[in-house]
Swiss-Prot record:
Keyword Transferase in record: yes
Source organism per UniProt: Arabidopsis thaliana (Mouse-ear cress)
Glycosylated residue positions: 113, 298
Key words of the record: Glycoprotein, Golgi apparatus, Membrane, Methyltransferase, Signal-anchor, Transferase, Transmembrane, Transmembrane helix
Family listed: Belongs to the methyltransferase superfamily.
Enzyme class: transferase
Protein localization: Golgi apparatus membrane
Listed name of the protein: Probable methyltransferase PMT15
Broad class of where this protein is predominantly found: Golgi
Amino acid sequence: MGNYRWPSKLSKLSLRAKQTNLYRVILIAILCVTFYFVGVWQHSGRGISRSSISNHELTSVPCTFPHQTTPILNFASRHTAPDLPPTITDARVVQIPSCGVEFSEYTPCEFVNRSLNFPRERLIYRERHCPEKHEIVRCRIPAPYGYSLPFRWPESRDVAWFANVPHTELTVEKKNQNWVRYEKDRFLFPGGGTMFPRGADAYIDEIGRLINLKDGSIRTAIDTGCGVASFGAYLMSRNIVTMSFAPRDTHEAQVQFALERGVPAIIGVLASIRLPFPARAFDIAHCSRCLIPWGQYNGTYLIEVDRVLRPGGYWILSGPPINWQRHWKGWERTRDDLNSEQSQIERVARSLCWRKLVQREDLAVWQKPTNHVHCKRNRIALGRPPFCHRTLPNQGWYTKLETCLTPLPEVTGSEIKEVAGGQLARWPERLNALPPRIKSGSLEGITEDEFVSNTEKWQRRVSYYKKYDQQLAETGRYRNFLDMNAHLGGFASALVDDPVWVMNVVPVEASVNTLGVIYERGLIGTYQNWCEAMSTYPRTYDFIHADSVFSLYKDRCDMEDILLEMDRILRPKGSVIIRDDIDVLTKVKKITDAMQWEGRIGDHENGPLEREKILFLVKEYWTAPAPDQSSDP
């Protein structure tokens, strides 16, 4: 007991330190376990995480696309392609201003003030004369105050809102010809015309007694000097689609009326350049008092009709000078003058190897030969015009008119009935039958297999579009369609059962000129350079489709100018679908945001791994202001 030692002060302090460290270890362990279970609880979805707060903020933003069925794809902040411009936040997007109300019917390439600088001879001043780069108007064209969505087809054939085309000139100048009447807040189209006082239906029935309009052999027509396009409007019920054209002149609203009625039409004139169509495009050509001097200038204008007329096609003429013996007093012309004019026309038609089928009362019909076998043999006897050499018959963009005859493709035999270029199927089989230009191998790289697969591809794509856009899927919501890069016309062919018509554009920059194939399918279209404005009025189309257009025009012209032209020709509340590489669409959407279009980017129909995406857009409704109000929406 005497050897026992009490613990020293130092040993007591050491014991207390060990106890404190133990407590700390236990406390840290408890906290770690607690944080672990809290983390598990949050990841299970029962907690409020930062991501869930962020999602709540996103979903609270209102969206005006009730038909949206797939997620919006947003590449603006995360896409890092080297050629993209710096990201612009929504707060910094500069809106493209609206134009003044004086631009509400602006047609850039048929602008009256500019056209007066060109020769009046042969109406050259009424041809396309587009602005220079420094003259391009870079603002959004307003609809007139009070603009309303057009009536739906077929009601639109007979009625249009006055506020949409606020012109009464035709109701005065053509009052006795029953073109158009103005009643209260709308225009009525009785279907009359200068040469069809009993109406367009009765007039077409008269033509049908001379040539067969019912068996599907006649599908495409061209109407020169169309007026308000009643001829084309009433042919639609007979499954004949008509390209109507007229110049922008004192009857300044005639083509605009046609488009408002839901009838295909463009601004155009026969003057010094070819029509913007390929050779052998139309089954019939029509002129009802169109006032074109067919027999003058060495028959140049009839030679151009011959170029675009299909082998075996018909040219129909009514009005001066046909039946001049009866009408010469009413036309306020002399008998000798009218007789001379008809003699000139007859002489030119014979020189083209046309055969006059019939002249009955106010109608005359000529037929183009199915081939040029006999025409070439008789060329020495006929004399002028000679056959063209070293010319491209399908060129139709700023190509000068010629006084030579466009030769038809060679035929294998000497039969007069053998169709040069190949016999076309009758409508509706014509739509999906192999076009002769593909069958002959004249289009490089386009085969029968590609044609079939292209048709099937666009059937799938249009079905996919309709799942995204309920307005497109709604029968009758849209009438006037534009395909800016139509290729083989697959987009239009997929819509053939809908009550719509499609203007199929083949850009002049396209690697292969396929517009002839489009016409051989029984569809219509035109050539166009999208660095320039289209020859049409503002608010022409309900729907615009642009497949790879901006990739095609990269480094050719300003993307903003193309989009502003699309804005000009698109109706308020109209829709646009743009397909292109995602880098391109990202740039496009920044501009359409500045144009105050509403849009979203969706996946390719084959899935999200495709670089090509689809931009769905809607143009907002806005108009020119009421008096003393700002024009910007």
